[in-house]
């Protein structure tokens, strides 16, 4: 089951959990109200997983690739990690399936507070187009993820502020309806 919580405001290494004391957990229903979808799958059989194929078919996730985020495998690792951690949005959904390793997706709630979502092997998440978010590996500095797309991949990040995009406006309308 996914673990998520409101982040503390402490400065420091973004790869640390940043759990407040006392803890402020966030459940799947609260994530769903933000448009975030989550599945737990068997990452050991991702190449032939009927459950993954069903999700891909139902949601039209027709294109995929695999990215390994670690110093030895990802060119310009430090630069990429900083880029992933910049607060941004996309004009399309962001779909990630963790095949190995772990990391954190941070998303903004309706009050603009950060929610940290711990992702580990077998976790698959969809972040809706228009949601402000960021990603970092955890202290293990390693994550292998499947990136899925509807149609041809478009991976353009628009750093905040990016409220003028239609995807952001549509997302804000969605949030207003889930109030």
UniProtKB/Swiss-Prot annotation:
The keyword Metal-binding applies. Its cofactor is Fe(2+); Ni(2+). Pfam families: ARD (PF03079). Binds either 1 Fe or Ni cation per monomer. Iron-binding promotes an acireductone dioxygenase reaction producing 2-keto-4-methylthiobutyrate, while nickel-binding promotes an acireductone dioxygenase reaction producing 3-(methylsulfanyl)propanoate. One of its GO terms (biological process) is methionine metabolic process. Pathway: Amino-acid biosynthesis; L-methionine biosynthesis via salvage pathway; L-methionine from S-methyl-5-thio-alpha-D-ribose 1-phosphate: step 5/6. It comes from the Eukaryota. Its EC number is 1.13.11.54, 1.13.11.53. Fe(2+) binds at residues 88, 90, 94, 133. It is a peripheral membrane protein. GO terms for molecular function: acireductone dioxygenase (Ni2+-requiring) activity; acireductone dioxygenase [iron(II)-requiring] activity; iron ion binding; nickel cation binding. GO terms for cellular component: cytoplasm; nucleus; plasma membrane. Gene3D superfamilies: Jelly Rolls. It catalyses: 1,2-dihydroxy-5-(methylsulfanyl)pent-1-en-3-one + O2 = 4-methylsulfanyl-2-oxobutanoate + formate + 2 H(+); 1,2-dihydroxy-5-(methylsulfanyl)pent-1-en-3-one + O2 = 3-(methylsulfanyl)propanoate + CO + formate + 2 H(+). Signal peptide: none annotated. Belongs to the acireductone dioxygenase (ARD) family. PANTHER family: ACIREDUCTONE DIOXYGENASE. Catalyzes 2 different reactions between oxygen and the acireductone 1,2-dihydroxy-3-keto-5-methylthiopentene (DHK-MTPene) depending upon the metal bound in the active site. Fe-containing acireductone dioxygenase (Fe-ARD) produces formate and 2-keto-4-methylthiobutyrate (KMTB), the alpha-ketoacid precursor of methionine in the methionine recycle pathway. Ni-containing acireductone dioxygenase (Ni-ARD) produces methylthiopropionate, carbon monoxide and formate, and does not lie on the methionine recycle pathway. Also down-regulates cell migration mediated by MMP14. Monomer. Interacts with MMP14. This is Acireductone dioxygenase. The lineage of its organism: Eukaryota, Metazoa, Chordata, Craniata, Vertebrata. The gene is ADI1.
């Amino acid at each position: 089951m996914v673990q998520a919580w409101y982040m503390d405001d402490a400065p420091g290494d973004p790869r640390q959990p940043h759990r407040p004391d006392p803890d402020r957990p966030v459940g799947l229903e609260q994530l769903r109200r933000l448009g975030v979808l989550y599945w737990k799958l068997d990452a050991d059989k991702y190449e032939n997983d009927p459950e993954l194929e069903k999700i891909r078919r139902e949601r039209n996730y027709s294109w995929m690739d695999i990215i390994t985020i670690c110093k030895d495998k990802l060119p310009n690792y430090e630069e990429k990690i900083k880029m992933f951690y910049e607060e941004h949005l996309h004009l399309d959904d962001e779909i990630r399936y963790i095949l190995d390793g772990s990391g954190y997706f941070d998303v903004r709630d309706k009050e603009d507070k950060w929610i940290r979502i711990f992702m580990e092997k077998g976790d698959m998440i969809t972040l809706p187009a228009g949601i402000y978010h960021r990603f970092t590996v955890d202290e293990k500095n390693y994550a292998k993820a499947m990136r899925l797309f509807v149609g041809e991949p478009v991976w353009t990040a628009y750093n905040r502020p990016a409220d003028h995009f239609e995807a952001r406006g549509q997302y804000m309308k969605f949030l207003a309806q889930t109030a």
